[in-house]
Amino acid sequence: MAKTSAVEKNNRRRKMADRYANKRAALKAIVMDQGKPMEERFKAQLQLAALPRNSSKTRIRNRCEVTGRPRAFYRKLKMSRIALRELGSQGLIPGLVKSSW
């Protein structure tokens, strides 16, 4: 199990990223628009830099929904390989069958 504080920190980052997503996208669009004057683009860049660091999506870490483990994460299932193996062997994941040949 991961530390509860690490999982909570990641959850706070997710909420903050959702809260600032529209504002961040609008500022990035202004910064990338070559048709805008340089002063306006620079001002938008400064506003973007003034936003909280944790409002960026790149600060979010993919973590297992079951254990909170940050590594060996399957995006499609939102869980780690260890949790996948345990739940799969218990038959709790539909369609997952232990292979044998």
From Swiss-Prot:
PROSITE patterns assigned: RIBOSOMAL_S14
Family recorded in the similarity comment: Belongs to the universal ribosomal protein uS14 family.
Organism encoding this protein: Chelativorans sp. (strain BNC1)
Stored InterPro entries: Ribosomal_uS14 (IPR001209), Ribosomal_uS14_bac/plastid (IPR023036), Ribosomal_uS14_CS (IPR018271)
GO BP: translation
Task of the protein: Binds 16S rRNA, required for the assembly of 30S particles and may also be responsible for determining the conformation of the 16S rRNA at the A site.
Pfam families in the cross-refs: Ribosomal_S14 (PF00253)
Gene symbol of the encoding locus: rpsN
SUPFAM superfamilies in UniProt: Glucocorticoid receptor-like (DNA-binding domain) (SSF57716)
Subunit: Part of the 30S ribosomal subunit. Contacts proteins S3 and S10.
Signal sequence interval, chain numbering: none
UniProt KW keywords: Ribonucleoprotein, Ribosomal protein, RNA-binding, rRNA-binding
Name of the protein described by the UniProt record: Small ribosomal subunit protein uS14
Membrane-traversing stretches: none
One Gene Ontology cellular component: cytoplasm
GO MF annotations, alphabetized: rRNA binding; structural constituent of ribosome
